[in-house]
Amino acid sequence: DAKLSTLPVFKSKLYRDENMNMRGMDFEAMRAMLLDTAERLGMDTDNLVITDDTPSAEMQAATVEKFASMGEEVPDGYFDPTSLIVEQDGIRIEVVPAMNAIITFDPAKVFPNGLGFHYYSPYEDVEKTAEYIKEEYKELLNMYNPITDINGGDYNIYGERGVDLCFYDGAEDLTQRIINYNFYYTSFSCNESEELFHVCVHNCDLSDKVGDYPIITAKEAKKLLLSGNFVTSVPYDFPGGEYVKKVELIYRTDAGYYIPYYRFYVELPEAEREGGMKTYGAYYVPAVKEEYIENMPLWDGSFNS
């Protein structure tokens, strides 16, 4: 069990205005991340042309016409840019408001020596390719101690198990390691031909720290779970404590705040598939002590998230 007494809570700088337009972006920081990512990929940063996602004049005109056909006007700020983009030599980078750098390769990158994977590849294939990626893309990863995180494990209707490949920096400090795992990580995705075509560098802005808050243990969180204090999107009644199979400490975004939660994986008897394949639902319990939370999420049997 993790020996932690407190964890930080952060406030997101991003929000939606009255017209549901994204606001709070730091375009200067986004530009810096864009150029830094391009440099780490070996792109010629002196000759990059930075664009944004502002719709073309033709698209704007079509949108205005569509709104007019419904007797409405386009809301203020509807066409404002939200991301920055560069493209060069088959590499495209887009930095979005959440401070993620989304990288696409066209054509996709072919791995050497029979390496490579796709979403439903065996775990061993992903693991072998991860070691190659860790070395080949070390400049992009920019981590002192890159930890391989092969996560997922869901099965489709054909019994194929899907996994995702990520890396995060394994800091010595446990709190920082949790922060890195949740907010500062890089994911790699391959196409069906097992070629690398997509990378996402996550670098969330956590500069607005609310404070460090006392947290409960996983055992205490399970007691709250069993008493109905949780948040879930599972459409069934909670089946009982004997169906709780796993717990992990993660962060969720609630009303603009990044808050630590315990995520419990619970077997769902109603959702068991043919052949005895199990289905699990995620149930979330706040890790912050109850006296610091204004409204504990009490389960009322409704479909919530």
Q: Which ranges hold each PLM region?
A:
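Short, low-complexity, Pro/Ser/Thr/Gly-rich segments in the mature regions of secreted, periplasmic
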Residues: A287-S305
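Generic ordered-secondary-structure signal
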Residues: D1, E242, I250-R252, E290, ...
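Short, solvent-exposed coil/turn segments at beta-strand boundaries
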Residues: G90, P97-N100, S189-E195, Y257-I259, ...
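Segments that shape or occlude catalytic/ligand-binding pockets
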Residues: G114, H118-Y280
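Preferential activation on post-signal-peptide N-terminal prodomains/segments
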Residues: D1-I178, F303
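Intrinsically disordered, low-complexity regulatory tails
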Residues: G276-G281, V285-Y292
